[in-house]
């Protein structure tokens, strides 16, 4: 049983704590005109232990601004599903629910974050159970919908910003700091795209994450590089549908 538990923990930590990152700040009205369109793409996730291919898509459900961003992938003897439900009204993203379902052989691991905006409470169900008060006048994102906000911030011309994310184990809501550091290039399905590179550094985790945004694709994040003491992790877009 020990190898099974170890693999699930590896997959969980890699995807949940390294995969994504960037969120919301109160900024100028320049953002009001920026809309992030729906998309669907094939991504490949790799690190030194795991490689998986999956579909990631952003879906708008109705005119009231209810949206979902999700990632579904398969790997040997298992699968993973990550879903973020949120609403977007007057250019403000409001988190609703964040759900993770990992299955590997006979092991199942489900986790859910509930953002109760009415009561101002954030609750975690699953392996880590906790309840945390949301911060007044601060927008708190989840690990998926934060990437919508990083795109908005870069489109608006922000070079540095700080956004709020919960620690998935403890519930502590922490500021994550981001900075535009460079330009680069990345090839997707035979086309080379110029990119703006945004870096996040978390000193408490000894971790550095870089996001590659392609202006020609509505600033879509087409590559993520993550480095920490456990090694390198990569998420790369292979094809858009």
Q: What is each model feature region?
A:
Residues 28-29:
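N-terminal signal peptide c-region/cleavage motif recognized by signal peptidases
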Residues 108-153:
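Hydrophobic, well-structured mid-protein blocks that either form specific transmembrane helices
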Residues 16-22:
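Sec-dependent signal peptide recognition
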Residues 34-117, 157-241:
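Acidic, serine/threonine-rich low-complexity disordered tracts
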Residues 5-8:
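Acidic, Ala/Val/Gly-enriched low-complexity intrinsically disordered segments
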């Amino acid at each position: 049983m020990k190898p099974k538990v170890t693999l699930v923990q590896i997959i969980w930590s890699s995807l949940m704590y390294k995969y994504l990152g960037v969120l919301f700040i109160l900024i100028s009205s320049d953002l009001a005109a920026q809309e992030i369109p729906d998309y669907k793409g094939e991504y490949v996730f790799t690190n030194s232990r795991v490689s998986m291919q999956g579909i990631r898509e952003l879906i708008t459900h109705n005119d009231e601004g209810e949206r979902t961003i999700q990632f579904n992938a398969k790997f040997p003897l298992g699968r993973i599903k990550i879903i973020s439900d949120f609403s977007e009204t007057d250019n403000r993203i409001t988190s609703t629910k964040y759900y993770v379902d990992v299955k590997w052989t006979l092991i199942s691991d489900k986790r859910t974050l509930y953002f109760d905006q009415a009561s101002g409470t954030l609750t975690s169900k699953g392996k880590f159970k906790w309840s945390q008060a949301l911060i007044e006048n601060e927008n708190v994102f989840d690990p998926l919908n934060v990437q919508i906000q990083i795109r908005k911030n870069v489109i608006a011309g922000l070079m540095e910003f700080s956004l709020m994310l919960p620690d998935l184990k403890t519930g502590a809501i922490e500021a994550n700091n981001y900075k535009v550091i460079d330009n680069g290039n990345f090839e997707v399905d035979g086309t080379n795209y110029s990119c703006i590179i945004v870096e996040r550094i978390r000193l408490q985790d000894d971790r550095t994450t870089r996001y590659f945004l392609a202006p020609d694709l509505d600033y879509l994040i087409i590559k993520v590089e993550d480095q920490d003491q456990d090694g390198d992790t990569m998420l790369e877009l292979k094809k858009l549908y």
